[in-house]
């Protein structure tokens, strides 16, 4: 099972690196930074679904 380590987040600025991944909310995040910031702000309700677009 693939996981994403978000322990270093949230970060104030994300790069524009294009490595999409899909969250449990069925939203495609541009890269790990955007996803992990969303996880941090979701109070643990958002989880990783899979790499690539939803």
Curated annotation (Swiss-Prot):
It comes from the Eukaryota. The keyword Secreted applies. InterPro entries: Kazal-type_SerProtInhib, Kazal_dom, Kazal_dom_sf. The record marks 16-17 as: Reactive bond 3. Signal peptide: none annotated. Keywords: Disulfide bond, Glycoprotein, Protease inhibitor, Repeat, Secreted, Serine protease inhibitor. It holds the Pfam family Kazal_1. Residues 4-54 form the Kazal-like domain. GO terms for cellular component: extracellular region. Disulfide bonds join 6-36, 14-33, 22-54. GO terms for molecular function: serine-type endopeptidase inhibitor activity. PROSITE patterns: KAZAL_1, KAZAL_2. The keyword Cytoplasm does not apply. Glycans are attached at residue 43. It is found in: Secreted. PANTHER family: SERINE PROTEASE INHIBITOR KAZAL-TYPE 7, SERINE PROTEASE INHIBITOR KAZAL-TYPE 7 SPINK7. Avian ovomucoid consists of three homologous, tandem Kazal family inhibitory domains. This is Ovomucoid.
């Amino acid at each position: 099972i693939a996981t994403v380590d978000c322990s270093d987040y949230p970060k104030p600025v994300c790069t524009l690196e294009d490595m999409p991944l899909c969250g449990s909310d069925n939203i495609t995040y541009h890269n790990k930074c955007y996803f992990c910031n969303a996880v941090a702000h979701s109070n643990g309700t958002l989880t990783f679904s899979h790499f690539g677009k939803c």
